[in-house]
């Protein structure tokens, strides 16, 4: 009788089943990693937008002379607005209108410029010529509502001059 070498059909089926199960597990890990990557990418885009907006605001505020009350601005703006006077005769206000966009308005022109869509501002001023600014943006990922916020403390360079 001849000696037969090789795998039986059952051994081949078991090996194929183990291989398919391994591929399924690896694909599950891949999908989970991909979802995590996409979530983090979207989150970082939102945070980058907030920091770019904060940089625009900081550059202007640092050149300001003094903080003002929102009631001192020529037009009606929300109470949580950031209002400050510049070295010339202008007063600048940053405010959110109906949680839809962040606007910048100068008292000399009274036309609002959109700074960032979907970004809300909240500002607290201190008597020492500084303020705490918080920017917030709501965003959605796969049907889940998320909110990101950043904060920065800014000092006026020309305070008291």
Q: Where are these predicted regions, by residue range?
A:
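Aliphatic-rich helix starts adjacent to a transmembrane/signal segment
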Residues: 3-55
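Alpha-helix exit/C-cap motif
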Residues: 36, 52-73
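Short, surface-exposed interaction loops/tails
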Residues: 128-161
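Acidic surface patches and DE-rich sequence motifs
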Residues: 3, 86-87, 141
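Type IV pilin-like appendage domain
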Residues: 68-132, 147-149
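N-terminal cationic leader/targeting segments used for protein routing and processing
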Residues: 1-3, 147
């Amino acid at each position: 009788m001849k000696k037969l070498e090789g795998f039986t059909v059952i051994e081949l089926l078991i090996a194929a089943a183990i291989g398919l199960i391994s591929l399924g597990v690896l694909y599950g890990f891949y999908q989970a990693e991909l979802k995590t990557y996409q979530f983090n990418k979207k989150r970082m885009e939102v945070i980058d937008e907030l920091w770019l907006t904060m940089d625009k605001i900081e550059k202007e505020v640092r050149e300001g002379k003094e903080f003002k009350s929102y009631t001192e601005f020529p037009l009606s703006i929300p109470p949580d607005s950031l209002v400050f006077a510049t070295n010339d005769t202008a007063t600048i206000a940053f405010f959110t209108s109906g949680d839809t966009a962040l606007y910048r308005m100068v008292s000399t022109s009274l036309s609002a410029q959109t700074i960032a869509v979907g970004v809300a501002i909240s500002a607290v001023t201190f008597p020492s010529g500084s303020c705490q600014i918080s920017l917030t943006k709501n965003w959605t990922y796969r049907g889940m509502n998320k909110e990101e916020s950043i904060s920065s403390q800014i000092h006026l360079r020309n305070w008291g001059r």
